[in-house]
Each structure stands twice: as C-alpha cells, then as structure tokens.
C-alpha cells in the first residue's frame, strides 16, 4: 500500500459481512487485508471472549483502538469490530478517515448469523430484542462517519465487490 493513501475501513454491526467482504475484495485485487479482531487475537494470544471475560469490554476497546492505529498505515482494507464506534476517541479518529464503508444488514438476518455464537461476547445469549437494541444504539454513529453504505442482505458479495471496485478506481488510490 502507498502510505499516502487511505485504507478502506469496513464498519457495521457484527454479522454484516465485514470480514468476508474485506477478504474477498483484498484477494480479488491483491490488496492487503486486516481483520482487527483477528489481529487482536493473534497479537495478544487471547480470544475476544477471553479478553472480555478477563479484562472487560473497555479494556478490549482500548486494544481495538491501539491495533487500528497500528494497522491504519499498513493495510489496504481493514475490517473493524462492530462496536469499534462505541469509544468517543475511536469514533473521532474514524471521522477523520476518508474511506469508511458501512455494511448494514437486516437485524433478523444478523440474528440468524450470530445467535449464540460464543465468539461474539456482545451477542452470546442475547434475545433478538436485546440485539436489536444494541444495533439501534449504533446506527447513528455508523451513519455519521460512513462515506458509503451497502446493505449486505440486498446485494451479493460480488455486487458489493464491484461497487467497492468502482470506489477504489474513482479514488485512484490503488
């Protein structure tokens, strides 16, 4: 990646396809890709649920921001965790980034994808109403910083890929 260029940063609620789409686009275009959650797990040798359990959510959010800052100048595409916008400091940092792409999805589909997933501490053992409340609490923040929004339940991976490819070409960065 040319370090004068801004990465594509995928934001959105858990289960909307950020990691899947980010990896797909990176593979198709021979770009570098980092999934922040995977990066954290590799770097700290703990799973996300273990970090939540041992240290709490705020500690995890601090790690998330540290890792985002480490990756911002080295990755072409970054998939963030769904709650990355919870911290005011991270939110303000992201507001200053150029290529923020919001992947959104219908809450019923999200619920079917992540219900009782032990790797998602903010989703495990939650009712659809509890998950929807969390989702609704984040929508305005996603919307405020997103350059572009894609509804991943209405578009296929390849359709989102071609839309992102058009954005990449239009920005003439890669």
Curated annotation (Swiss-Prot):
Alphabetically ordered keywords of this record: Amino-acid biosynthesis, Aromatic amino acid biosynthesis, ATP-binding, Cytoplasm, Kinase, Magnesium, Metal-binding, Nucleotide-binding, Transferase
Superkingdom as given in the UniProt entry: Bacteria
Note describing how the cofactor binds: Binds 1 Mg(2+) ion per subunit.
Pathway: Metabolic intermediate biosynthesis; chorismate biosynthesis; chorismate from D-erythrose 4-phosphate and phosphoenolpyruvate: step 5/7
Pfam family, one: SKI
Cross-referenced SUPFAM superfamilies: P-loop containing nucleoside triphosphate hydrolases
Cellular component terms (Gene Ontology): cytosol
InterPro entries associated with the record: P-loop_NTPase, Shikimate/glucono_kinase, Shikimate_kinase/TSH1, Shikimate_kinase_CS
Binding residues for substrate: 37, 61, 82, 138
Location within or outside the cell: Cytoplasm
CDD domains: SK
Reaction(s) the record says it catalyses: shikimate + ATP = 3-phosphoshikimate + ADP + H(+)
Example GO BP: amino acid biosynthetic process
Binding residues for ATP: 15-20, 120
EC number(s) reported in the record: 2.7.1.71
Residues engaged in binding Mg(2+): 19
TM regions (residue ranges): none
GO MF terms held by the record: ATP binding; magnesium ion binding; shikimate kinase activity
Known cofactor(s): Mg(2+)
Enzyme's top EC category: transferase
HAMAP family found in the cross-reference section: Shikimate_kinase
Function: Catalyzes the specific phosphorylation of the 3-hydroxyl group of shikimic acid using ATP as a cosubstrate.
Subunit structure: Monomer.
Annotated family: Belongs to the shikimate kinase family.
Protein name listed in UniProt: Shikimate kinase
Protein source organism: Staphylococcus aureus (strain MRSA252)
Gene that produces this protein: aroK
């Amino acid at each position: 990646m040319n370090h004068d260029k801004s990465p594509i940063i995928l934001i959105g609620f858990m289960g909307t396809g950020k990691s899947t789409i980010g990896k797909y686009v990176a593979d198709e275009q021979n770009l570098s890709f980092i999934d922040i959650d995977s990066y954290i797990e590799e770097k700290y040798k703990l799973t996300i649920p273990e970090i939540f359990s041992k240290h709490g959510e705020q500690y995890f959010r601090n790690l998330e921001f540290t890792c985002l800052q480490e990756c911002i100048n080295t990755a072409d595409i970054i998939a963030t965790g769904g709650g990355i916008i919870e911290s005011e400091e991270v939110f303000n940092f992201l507001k200053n980034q150029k290529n923020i792409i919001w992947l959104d999805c219908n809450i019923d589909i999200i619920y079917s994808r992540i219900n009782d997933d032990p790797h998602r501490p903010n989703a495990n053992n939650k009712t659809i109403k509890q998950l929807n409340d969390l989702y609704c609490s984040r929508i305005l923040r996603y919307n405020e910083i997103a350059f572009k929004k894609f509804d991943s339940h209405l578009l296929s991976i390849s359709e989102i890929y071609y839309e992102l490819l058009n954005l990449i070409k239009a920005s003439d960065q890669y």
